[in-house]
């Protein structure tokens, strides 16, 4: 299967290989419910806590940076 490079900019999609621009309508959709409030809980995707403390990483010096 061939890989296609696509560039996304606003409501336009252009295929880099063919230079063909397609226009898609931008439709805003909203839905309100007055009877029940829906609460979505974000999942962490089983991420583990970081191995390094953030303050420790900030305290490290990099001699190659300057």
From Swiss-Prot:
Keyword terms of this UniProt record: Chloroplast, Plastid, Transit peptide
GO CC terms: chloroplast
Protein location: Plastid, Chloroplast
Induction remarks: By coronalon.
Transit peptide region: 1-25
Annotated disulfide bonds: none
Tissue: Expressed exclusively in flowers.
Family classification: Belongs to the terpene synthase family. Tpsb subfamily.
UniProt-recorded name of the protein: Putative inactive (E)-beta-ocimene synthase, chloroplastic
Native organism: Arabidopsis thaliana
Gene it is expressed from: TPS02
